[in-house]
């Protein structure tokens, strides 16, 4: 088997739509020189055919295939030697140009598929920088809030609970889990302070206050001060007790009044 040479005229000429010089004047002959039947005899030689002037009203343009390979149409020459020489040079030049353009295109597209372009890489870097700056600002905004929550003073009740929990080491784990649900977030204690435990009045104090209330429902500041010192109560406690007692009396009176109506 013979390999086709890419630069041979018999292989490239049909692709470029160029005819060999012999096809211009020997189209009615076979390859062995025998005349085909049914075709008129040629009464002139090869030299006369090549020397005849080419005059045609219609301009012969190369088809789209030849333009795709060469880019322009090849003019016809009167001399067969010039035609063959121009054909050979044109074949070589077109092949070199087409090969060069092909490899140039391949070199442009031979970049790695997983490698991003420069513009895309710059966009990604700018986007990542923007996200990092945003996260940094959020962290800076959250940090002072956490510090302010942590630095809040604890109430007296929490201190007492800590002091009472200290001797019992085995129950520390269970007691640490409970405040996590009641105080809110573990790193930020709840804003609501625990209410002080209500200190009940003793019986002697209640009897003394009741006697004073029977004598006078409203007391002045001086009398309230004397009661607080005598009963070992604060001025606020005495004041609140008298207010509550007056409201209680009022409710009882309203209830009796409603019963009498109905």
UniProtKB/Swiss-Prot annotation:
Main location: nucleus
DNA-binding region per UniProt: 194-253
Molecular function terms from GO: DNA-binding transcription factor activity, RNA polymerase II-specific; sequence-specific double-stranded DNA binding
Pfam families cross-referenced by the UniProt entry: Homeodomain
rRNA-binding among keywords: no
Coiled-coil ranges from the UniProt annotation: none
Family the UniProt entry places it in: Belongs to the Abd-B homeobox family.
Keywords: Developmental protein, DNA-binding, Homeobox, Nucleus, Transcription, Transcription regulation
Gene designation: hoxd12a
Lineage: Eukaryota, Metazoa, Chordata, Craniata, Vertebrata
UniProt superkingdom: Eukaryota
Function: Sequence-specific transcription factor which is part of a developmental regulatory system that provides cells with specific positional identities on the anterior-posterior axis.
UniProt subcellular location: Nucleus
Region called Disordered, residue ranges: 107-130
Protein name (database record): Homeobox protein Hox-D12a
A Gene Ontology cellular-component term: nucleus
């Amino acid at each position: 088997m013979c390999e086709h040479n890419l630069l041979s005229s018999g292989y490239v000429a049909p692709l470029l739509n160029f005819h060999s010089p012999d096809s211009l004047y020997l189209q009615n002959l076979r390859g062995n020189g025998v005349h085909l039947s049914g075709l008129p005899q040629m009464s002139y030689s090869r030299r006369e055919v090549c020397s005849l002037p080419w005059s045609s009203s219609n301009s012969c343009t190369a088809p789209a295939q030849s333009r795709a390979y060469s880019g322009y149409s090849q003019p016809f020459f009167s001399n067969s030697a010039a035609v063959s020489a121009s054909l050979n040079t044109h074949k070589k030049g077109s092949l070199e140009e087409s090969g060069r353009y092909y490899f140039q295109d391949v070199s442009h597209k031979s970049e790695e598929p997983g490698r991003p372009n420069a513009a895309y890489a710059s966009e990604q870097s700018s986007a990542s920088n923007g996200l990092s700056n945003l996260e940094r600002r959020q962290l800076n905004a959250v940090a002072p809030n956490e510090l302010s929550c942590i630095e809040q003073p604890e109430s007296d009740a929490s201190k007492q609970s800590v002091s009472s929990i200290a001797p019992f080491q085995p129950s520390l784990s269970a007691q640490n889990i409970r405040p996590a649900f009641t105080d809110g977030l573990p790193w930020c204690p709840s804003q609501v302070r625990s209410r002080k435990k209500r200190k009940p009045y003793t019986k002697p104090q209640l009897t003394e206050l009741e006697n004073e209330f029977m004598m006078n429902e409203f007391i002045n500041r001086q009398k309230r001060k004397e009661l607080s010192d005598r009963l070992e109560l604060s001025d606020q406690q005495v004041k609140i007790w008298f207010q509550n007692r007056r409201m209680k009396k009022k409710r009882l009176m309203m209830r009796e009044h409603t019963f009498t109506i109905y």
